[in-house]
Amino acid sequence: MSDSQVRKGLNGVISDYTSISKVMPESNSLTYRGYAVEDLVENCSFEEVIYLLWFGELPTTEQLRTFNTTGRSYRSLDAGLISLIHSLPNTCHPMDVLRTAVSYMGTFDPDPFTRDADHIRSIGHNLLAQLPMVVAMDIRRRSGEEIIAPDHNKGIASNFLSMVFGNDDGSVANSADDIRDFERSLILYAEHSFNASTFSARVISSTRSDTYSAITGAIGALKGPLHGGANEFVMHTMLDIDDPNNAADWMGKALDRKERIMGFGHRVYKNGDSRVPSMEKSMRSLAARHRGQKWVHMYESMQEVMEARTGIKPNLDFPAGPAYYMLGFPVDFFTPLFVLARVSGWTAHIVEQFENNALIRPLSAYNGVEEREVVPISERT
């Protein structure tokens, strides 16, 4: 097999069909079920987008009401899971807590190996209801704060912000603008074709393993800094720079050292990430309300240097990092926020994989030593 036949990282390999989303790098655009993501961000709730991803069409008023009622009915945590979360060390990464929680939830699945789409979607409902509770609990237990119960009258974004930050005066959970900007990020992070975590979920599903195992594997993939973990590294970089006036110099020196700077470049988009303008709009909106112009100036300076020196443009993680920071989230929890959104896309892909399944099993090109015989241990040197 020649080197030209080996596609490292499956770069450019088309492994299957999907009707869920379409990434179009040539036109710098992304659609969910045919709708431009920027159109969905401006005109739909996160719940409407989840429904679209799962069923292929935007819901009617009655369909959305039923969908929301079903989803909110799952907002309760098993006592054993609560105890498990509190037993985990505060030093572990929050993604480890999520991964452990999903694995625990899977032990209660009465029919783990079913390929029934409705059952898989019910698991999706369960995860979309309970994982925000897990993340909120984890945030508050690490800071010694009391756990806040979910509100069954609120949407996913609003309820989550309430569970994390409470509802006192000044809380972002009481600001319609803050809730909407956070919800926009959930829509933008919800789905993105065959990315590493989604492909991991599909690989696991292709073996006919259970949905919880597929989601657990996807969380493991998303934890990596070359995938979902990048938004955390973006903010750590900004905090390290600290002063916007130092950003250009910091970037220049980092590029001179040929360091990888998270938040820039994309495996598919070569002319810019189509989701960035919508997320940047929310980032600037949050900065205006939360005295965050420092981060906007730093963002602009870093972007300017990177594009001038390399031509590489930002990806979604670059504006999302400071946006989440201005909302008040601890940096280590940025990637779990990604999970809360992407569970919707993962669920849609697991259903699609089961509908027309083929075991995913690529070939490899061997480049080790040629075949040889075993030498008795007494004769080895």
From Swiss-Prot:
Described by its record, this protein's role is as follows: Catalyzes the Claisen condensation of propionyl-CoA and oxaloacetate (OAA) to yield 2-methylcitrate (2-MC) and CoA. Also catalyzes the condensation of oxaloacetate with propionyl-CoA but with a lower specificity.
Extra remark beyond the main annotation: The prpD1B1C1 operon seems not to be involved in propionate degradation.
One Pfam family it belongs to: Citrate_synt
| Molecular function as annotated in GO | 2-methylcitrate synthase activity; citrate (Si)-synthase activity; citrate synthase activity
Alphabetically ordered keywords of this record:
Transferase, Tricarboxylic acid cycle
- Which residues are involved in binding substrate? H192, R275, R342, R361
Domain of life according to the entry:
Bacteria
Which InterPro entries does the record cross-reference, listed alphabetically?
Answer: 2-MeCitrate/Citrate_synth_II, Citrate_synth-like_lrg_a-sub, Citrate_synth-like_sm_a-sub, Citrate_synthase, Citrate_synthase_AS, Citrate_synthase_bac-typ, Citrate_synthase_sf
- Outline the subunit composition: Homodimer.
Q: Which organism is it from?
A: Corynebacterium glutamicum (strain ATCC 13032 / DSM 20300 / JCM 1318 / BCRC 11384 / CCUG 27702 / LMG 3730 / NBRC 12168 / NCIMB 10025 / NRRL B-2784 / 534)
Q: Gene of origin?
A: prpC1
Taken from the UniProt entry, a GO cellular component term is: cytosol
**Family that this chain belongs to:** Belongs to the citrate synthase family.
Q: Which catalytic residues are annotated?
A: H227, H266, D317
The name this protein carries in UniProt is 2-methylcitrate synthase 1
Pathway membership: Carbohydrate metabolism; tricarboxylic acid cycle
Against Gene3D superfamilies, the record matches this protein to:
Citrate Synthase, domain 1, Cytochrome P450-Terp, domain 2
Q: Where does CoA bind?
A: R260, I261, M262, G263, F264
Q: Which NCBIfam families match?
A: cit_synth_II, PRK14033.1
Q: Catalysed reaction per UniProt?
A: propanoyl-CoA + oxaloacetate + H2O = (2S,3S)-2-methylcitrate + CoA + H(+); oxaloacetate + acetyl-CoA + H2O = citrate + CoA + H(+)
Offer one example of a GO biological process linked to this entry.
carbohydrate metabolic process
Record flagged with keyword Transferase: yes
Q: What induces it?
A: By propionate.
Q: What is its EC number?
A: 2.3.3.5, 2.3.3.16
